[in-house]
Amino acid sequence: MRDLIDSDVLRHAVNSTMERYPYFCVELQKKGEQYIFAENHRPVVITNSLHGVDLNTEDSNFHMIAFCFQDNWIILDVFHGMTDGTGAYEVLRTLLYYYCSERYHVKLNDEGIRLAGDAVSEEEWVDPVANRNDLPIPPRNEMSNALNLIASAGLENDHRHTVYSISISESEFMRFNLDNDGSPGTMVSLLLSRAIAKLYPDSKDPIRITLCVNQRIALHTPLAHQSLVGGIMLEYKDKMRDWPLERQGTAYRGMVFAQNQEENVLMGVASQAGISRMILSKESDQERLGVVGYINSLAGRVITATVSYVGKANYREAEQYIRDFRLWTSSAAKGLTVEISAVNGRFTLDFLQTFSSPVFVNAFLKELEDNGIVYDLQDVNKLELPNIKLPWTE
């Protein structure tokens, strides 16, 4: 934030915010052989720390969500299995409205912001996938192995999780996208693909980037709070390497357009639902963890890296009080995830790595330089995320 955090005001803001989101006031419990989110009426925890507390433990009052602060930072920690970036952004819009209104003694415009006292609609509450039996059957596609960043760079012994944060002017990057038939997510995916290709020009394995997609549009459930994230596969084909950037951008946008058609997204939903049913059909937690491990290893084999862009944050009038914004997540597979956020006139690209080497960040920055894109490498941090105590790990 622009100024030091007032802990009393933050407490008031969190209380009002969580009143608006009862479906996030829960704890994860084991009931028989199943797991459920049970109501949790304990206060949501706020700590004076940058590292927060372990979620779903006594320290977090057994919540799957918590807040912390230090100096001028406010941090929201939330279980990704409960919601995704879209859902977390809604919580932050509400929190920032309440916090900034009281902290700066102003009346902010509340249009489009969810507030305490609102009626929570069924569309916001109910899982849009749980009872769907009309989803299209996904084809059984076998994908070849993708170029593996860790193996290619010889980083098997580098286990220091690290985040590199890069900022770019929003207006300048959007102009660059317009000139090259791109959009933020596709262009970052393309520039990353180009950077990796130049590092490994003789690789026989394809460079395949997963671009995250919001499934709410295809499900016609824009208000749903659940974690509804699918993926689009962007493969940097050999024949594309000699194309000009604009033609490459058009090709990537074409891949996005085709895979983002409603039926294709719904097939992805069906595939994820099928995996969930398969996991839950196992009789023991050990068997379920075995299936999860297999799925994660499969994803790690067919994906080179992941790029995620929730969309412009649009924190409304509260953005004037925001100095910096970061979006950090943990990756299911070992490797690289790039989280893109757009707040207060700039894009921030967080390179979230399960290793510390700057080889891929440096290659990406060289790609920015070669294309005349001005950037600021803000900082490099150890990637530390709160632990989540899950019942099946006991």
Residue ranges and their predicted role:
Residues R2-I5, F79-G87, S165, F176-P184, ...:
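Conserved aromatic-histidine-acidic binding/catalytic patches
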Residues S60-H105, E111-E124, S203, S341-F360:
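Histidine-centered acyl-transfer/condensation active-site motif
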Residues M1-D8, D59-I74, A151-R216, F347:
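Gly/Ser/Thr-rich phosphate-binding loops and adjoining beta-strand/alpha-helix segments
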Residues T83, L96-C100, L178-D181, L192-P201, ...:
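Hydrophobic/aromatic-lined pockets within catalytic cores
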Residues M1-Q34, H41-A66, K198-E394:
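Acyl-thioester-dependent acyl-group transfer interface
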Residues M1, M82-E90, T94-R175, L368-E394:
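Non-catalytic, low-complexity flexible loops and terminal extensions
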Residues Y35-E39, L115-A116:
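Conserved catalytic core of two-metal-ion nucleotidyltransferases
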